[in-house]
From Swiss-Prot:
Gene3D superfamilies associated with the record: 5' to 3' exonuclease, C-terminal subdomain (1.10.150.20), Cytidine Deaminase, domain 2 (3.40.140.10)
Domain MPN residues, every copy: 107-229
Family stated for the protein in its record: Belongs to the UPF0758 family.
Protein's UniProt name: UPF0758 protein BH3032
Amino acid sequence: MSNMSMTLRDVPNRERPRERLLHEGAHALSNQEIVAIMLRTGTKNESVLQLAQHVLCHFDGLRLLREATVEELTSIHGIGEAKAIEFCAAIELGRRIHTMQEMDRYVIRTPEDVSRFVMEEMRFLSQENFVCLYLNTKNQVLHKQTVFIGSLNASIVHPREVFKEALRRSAASLICLHNHPSGDPTPSREDIEVTHRLAQVGKLIGIELLDHVIIGDRTFVSLKEKGHLPFS
């Protein structure tokens, strides 16, 4: 195999990911095989399956791959800009489909429901994201919105921004949440102050703050369960 890059055609028929997908379904493929299909070709010294494994190792499996940028992908030998753009677009499409499926029917009744809804999306974030879930009278998620990115501070997270969307969506209630990039969801004094302030405004305008959930790495804390919601 002199100067030609190695493609999926160089893999024995029965082992080709595309053929396996056709005959066994996408669910039967390994992460490496799915990445290989997306890459299509390897390099003159590395098969496409080897390149796929190289990509997964570079990003610690799927853990960091979901946040991969074009710049990060093109830093890997064998991945050009066009291939990196297609890769990022496929990741974003999968993320959007997942979000739509979740929100179509997702009902929140407990802090565990909140955690299941956002954990995989939020536990890897490198900055604090303050997010609101707006619910209808059946506790179904109407809308999810990131209100603020950065260190949480009672003077920065303004109730106006939180409740403006609640009024626009005719929400019956809302749940606030944010992540701690450290992975430790223990609430800070600022977290508690923000919760009290939003609960007071919600009581005044008739849109109840049901909870404020802090997301860590595979763990979470409900400020309602900790007794920090003054009107619950």
